[in-house]
């Protein structure tokens, strides 16, 4: 078996001994999903800034490690932890939650979310300017990250805005020569070398003049049209929808995402929640079709609940 002590030493030099976990007890919160997914990892690394993340990736790629990128580890998709055993190489989990800066740009109409920034923090940051994130979803309350949502096209219950999607991101990939390569698709002038780009972004060392008025999408602009087509033979949402796969968007762990650029939305002046109950599922089908076909304004989100869920929520969730 290969001695990985030199690798661990190199990683500790980058992020500090405090943020390299190698014993089972400290690794468990990161190697076991809250919902599902569990397996062993050689180490868990917690970089604190973008350049540390880059240096950690370089070391891991050079040593041919399996890399699992992880943010909040909600366990909702099962992709942020090892899954069982039988891997052919050691696994390194890179947890990004310390890299949590959020930049408001374009008068708050867009944001830059770094690798570990959360929807909860984004909501707090946007509220004073009358804005809200794309994703107003349940997992916000358990620390779900902005980047994780984009990588998994999250937001299955979102009716009006659809899945999390952007064509503007900063990410690293392993190229055909087996080398780590940084790709800047944020459409922000941050420099040329990886180190320059990452340091400038981390420190928000750019001006409005550096932000390109991009024609690339920072949200899904076709979803309303798709979901209103109730006669379509194709579902409005399904896994691995090629329409939503664009580099960082839908990448699901195949690349390491450093930052994403996303649209924001005006907070509605008035919100209303409706609970509708029935003993006949056909009633819900008709309601759904009527709303999607005829309502001028679509609901922000919609969920189906079993009656037991409603009763439990009414009793325990206040």
Where are each of the predicted segments found?
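FAD-binding subdomain of flavoenzyme oxidoreductases
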Residues: 120, 127-283
């Amino acid at each position: 078996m290969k001695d990985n002590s030199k690798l661990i030493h190199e990683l500790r030099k980058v992020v500090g001994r405090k943020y390299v976990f190698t014993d089972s007890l400290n690794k468990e919160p990161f190697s076991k999903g809250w919902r599902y997914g569990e397996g062993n990892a050689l180490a868990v690394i917690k970089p604190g800034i973008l350049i540390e993340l880059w240096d950690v990736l370089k070391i891991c790629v050079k040593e041919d490690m399996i890399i699992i990128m992880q943010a909040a580890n909600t366990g909702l998709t099962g992709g942020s932890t090892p899954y069982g055993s039988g891997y052919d190489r050691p696994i390194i989990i890179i947890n990004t939650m310390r890299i949590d800066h959020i930049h408001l740009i374009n008068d708050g109409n867009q944001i830059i979310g770094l690798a570990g920034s959360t929807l909860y923090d984004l909501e707090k940051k946007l509220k004073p300017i009358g804005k809200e994130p794309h994703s107003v979803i349940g997992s916000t309350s358990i620390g779900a990250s902005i980047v994780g949502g984009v990588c998994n096209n999250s937001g299955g219950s979102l009716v009006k805005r659809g899945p999390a999607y952007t064509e503007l991101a900063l990410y690293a990939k392993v190229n055909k020569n087996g080398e780590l390569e940084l790709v800047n698709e944020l459409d922000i002038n941050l420099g040329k070398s990886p180190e320059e780009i990452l340091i400038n972004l981390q420190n928000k060392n750019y001006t409005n003049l550096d932000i390109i008025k991009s024609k690339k999408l920072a949200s899904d602009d076709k979803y309303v049209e798709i979901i209103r087509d109730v006669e379509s033979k194709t579902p409005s949402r399904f896994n691995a929808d090629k329409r939503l796969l664009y580099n960082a968007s839908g990448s699901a762990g195949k690349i390491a995402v450093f930052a994403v650029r996303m649209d924001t939305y005006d907070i509605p002046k008035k919100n209303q929640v409706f609970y509708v109950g029935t003993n006949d599922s056909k009633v819900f089908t008709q309601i759904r079709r009527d709303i999607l076909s005829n309502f001028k304004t679509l609901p922000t989100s919609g969920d189906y609940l079993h009656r037991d869920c409603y009763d439990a929520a009414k009793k325990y969730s206040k």
